[in-house]
Amino acid sequence: MEVVLYPDSVSRRALEAASDTNSTFHKGHYMSIKRVEARYKRRQIKRQRNRAAQTRTATFENTSSLQSLTDAAYEACKTIKWKNSVQKYMNNTMLNTLHAHKLMTGGSKITGRRKCFTLMERGKIRHIQASPFWEKVIQKTISRNVLIPCYTRSYTHGNSANQRGRGEMYAIKLLRKQLARHYRKHGSQGWILLCDYSNYFASIPREKVLQQASERIQDKRIMPWLEQLMDAECDSGLGLGAETNQQLAVGYVSKIDHWIEEQSGCEATGRYMDDLYVIDSDLLKLRSTLDEIKRMSEELGLTLNPVKTYITSLHHGFTWLKKKWYYTDTGRIITRPIPKTIKRMRQHLRALARLAARGELSWKQITAMYHSWRGTLKHYNAWRTIQSMDAYYKQLKAKNETL
């Protein structure tokens, strides 16, 4: 009898023995092929039942309901209540929620006029298209009720971006834990593969994103909403302004995460948005892993940045998420911000001091901004950097007060 291979973890010996119709699992014997098939079907039914329970909110009616839109409005305004447009919307929450409900259920246009601007983020120019607040409410309800339950349940442990309870600090703590485990086994001898995609958001093929979303979302009436939000952002790829695009972009390369963790055999891995790393003690294994990542990325329509994608030794240290990582002689893991980050912050403080000298900004506002940035350094080994920046900040403030 032919033995069928299933996606489950079934041992080779069990499958070989399953070809015998008389074999059982009793007293050390293996199951027959019929029992293997029956168990596989039960597992599939259980998975489908669990998936349906987890995505029960991902329906057209629930996503566009007045209650979901109201909850989304209060969630979306949490950090931007000082804005005039937000205050106008929240002063008439009931009427605005009803209007959004009619737009979503009536097949009308759910996107508004974009406000386009360019900003410099950590030395990189980013073109942003900001949507009006009423559209952000619609994006929030789609993200909360559809994308998060349909996507995040299948994310790997190392996927750190755009999830509740995760973020940059989660990614940093995870990498520290993995580096500590590696040192206990191999010392500082080992290798790390660092990958970064070229122009990640803009290069994501829109057709493949929609196809992936269609496979995850059962209610197909939701798909026109996603298509409208994508078309309003830009002509190709995904824009940086919509929350829905952030969720779709994080989940787009989840297939690669699963392959690395489950099939590559590498020691450790993690990803924050489009910044990926893989750790292993075998250099040849990492090279073959890189070749497979390139192949899978090409299938997804993405291209790895040749400058930022490389393999380096853990002994010499590496840079990830704008932080310098390395081992000491005793195995302690040191994490420090790169010098470019500190230099850029000094330039920023000088620019703010000039605004304060002209009376366009108060030092109370500058102090709040500086202490917010300073608080992030406390999570790293940057005591000397903090002392140096404090002295520089006090020098600028004293010089400004004497003018």
Task: Please report, for each region that a protein language model flagged, where it lies by residue.
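Conserved polymerase palm-domain catalytic core
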Residues: 173-273, 277-292, 296, 302-303, ...
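Reverse-transcriptase-like RNA-dependent polymerase core
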Residues: 102-124, 137, 144, 221-233
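Glycine-/proline-rich flexible loop or hinge segments
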Residues: 75-87, 119-129, 156-158
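Active-site-proximal segment of RNA-dependent polymerases
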Residues: 56-60, 143-202
